[in-house]
């Protein structure tokens, strides 16, 4: 079951506006090779903003 950990990678999501790293999630590198972008709530901006994967 070690190969499962290789496929799913732990990524950090940063707010597009304030650049703070608020969320951590896992993604499948085979299905999503490009950067992940989700709309999440930013506690510092106090609103929903786009959060993008950082490397």
Curated annotation (Swiss-Prot):
Keyword annotations: Ribonucleoprotein, Ribosomal protein
GO function term, MF aspect, one: structural constituent of ribosome
GO cellular component: cytoplasm; ribonucleoprotein complex; ribosome
Record-linked SUPFAM superfamilies: Zn-binding ribosomal proteins
Highest taxon of the lineage: Bacteria
Gene3D superfamilies: Ribosomal protein L33
GO process terms (BP): translation
Family, similarity comment: Belongs to the bacterial ribosomal protein bL33 family.
Protein name: Large ribosomal subunit protein bL33
Source organism of the structure: Rubrobacter xylanophilus (strain DSM 9941 / JCM 11954 / NBRC 16129 / PRD-1)
Lineage: Bacteria, Bacillati, Actinomycetota, Rubrobacteria, Rubrobacterales
């Amino acid at each position: 079951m070690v190969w499962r950990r290789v496929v799913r990678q732990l990524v950090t999501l940063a707010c597009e506006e304030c650049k703070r790293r608020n969320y951590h999630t896992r993604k499948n590198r085979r299905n999503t090779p490009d950067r992940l972008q989700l709309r999440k709530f930013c506690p510092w901006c106090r609103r929903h903003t786009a959060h993008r994967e950082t490397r």
